[in-house]
Amino acid sequence: MIYGLGTDICDIRRIRASLERHGERFAQRILSDAELATWTARSARWPDRGVSYLATRFSAKEAFSKAIGLGMRMPMTWRHCEIANAASGKPEIVLHGALKDWFDARQLTAHVTVSDETDYAASFCVVEKK
């Protein structure tokens, strides 16, 4: 049974501007430790891909927060929601801490998709009750 749906579109230029204003602190606020390691590696080699990576993660977390009906309120936090990739490349949501406990207590499962182009990143999330 569908519990919730969420979608988000993110202007990559806004993410780039935030990075220019706040530096790495902005990424540290949004990304989990694992995501931050990936972002750092991509940014060092291909700065534009690093910005796109951050934008897709931002967008996916926004879509997820809408699908669970909390928005960006506790227990939903940027760093407790991680967008990982399966070996196939498929994006997967990995939760941590109080958010994981909250999600598991409700017997929910989530599916997410992300896409990006030159100026925009978009995400769609479906949350189901098991």
Curated annotation (Swiss-Prot):
GO terms for molecular function: holo-[acyl-carrier-protein] synthase activity; magnesium ion binding. GO terms for cellular component: cytoplasm. Pfam families: ACPS. Mg(2+) binds at residues 8, 62. Transfers the 4'-phosphopantetheine moiety from coenzyme A to a Ser of acyl-carrier-protein. Gene3D superfamilies: 4'-phosphopantetheinyl transferase domain. Its cofactor is Mg(2+). SUPFAM superfamilies: 4'-phosphopantetheinyl transferase. Keywords: Cytoplasm, Fatty acid biosynthesis, Fatty acid metabolism, Lipid biosynthesis, Lipid metabolism, Magnesium, Metal-binding, Transferase. It is found in: Cytoplasm. InterPro entries: 4-PPantetheinyl_Trfase_dom, 4-PPantetheinyl_Trfase_dom_sf, ACPS, Ppantetheine-prot_Trfase_dom. Its EC number is 2.7.8.7. Belongs to the P-Pant transferase superfamily. AcpS family. It catalyses: apo-[ACP] + CoA = holo-[ACP] + adenosine 3',5'-bisphosphate + H(+). One of its GO terms (biological process) is fatty acid biosynthetic process. This is Holo-[acyl-carrier-protein] synthase.
